[in-house]
A protein has these predicted regions:
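C-terminal accessory domains and tails appended to enzymatic cores
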Residues: 1-104
Length: 104
C-alpha cells in the first residue's frame, strides 16, 4: 500500500510514543536520549523519517513490482509503502480480493 500521502500522519503517531522513539531508539543509536520537548515539529519529523521512514522506503523498493501491478504509474513513483502478506490462517482470499481490501 502506498504511504506517500500519509507519512506526516505516521510521523505524528510515532511522535506520540516518546519513550520508544526519542529515548530508547536514540539511546540505542547514539548512547543518550533525545529531549523532544526542545525540538520543533520539523526536527522531529526529519528524525522520524530518517530512523523510521527508511523501513517504508525499503518496503516500496522491495515491493516495486507489486506496487506497479496494483497502482500503475503511481506504484512506479511511490517513495513510501507498507507491505502486507496473505496469511495461511483464517479465511483464504484471492489476490484480487486482497488488493481490493487494501485500496484506499
Amino acid at each position: 500500500m502506498i504511504c506517500d500521502d500519509v507519512m506526516d500522519e505516521k510521523c505524528r503517531m510515532l511522535d506520540c510514543h516518546v519513550s520508544q522513539v526519542y529515548e530508547w531508539l536514540y539511546y540505542e543509536i547514539r548512547g543518550c536520549a533525545l529531549d523532544p520537548s526542545r525540538m520543533t515539529w520539523e526536527e522531529k519529523k526529519a528524525y522520524l523519517l530518517e530512523h523510521w521512514g527508511t523501513r517504508y522506503e525499503n518496503a516500496a523498493n522491495e515491493a516495486r513490482e507489486a506496487l506497479i501491478a496494483s497502482y500503475g504509474d503511481a506504484g512506479k513513483n511511490a517513495r513510501y509503502a507498507e507491505t502486507f502478506e496473505l496469511s495461511p490462517y483464517g479465511r483464504k482470499v484471492s489476490v484480487e480480493e486482497f488488493r481490493e481490501l487494501m485500496r484506499p
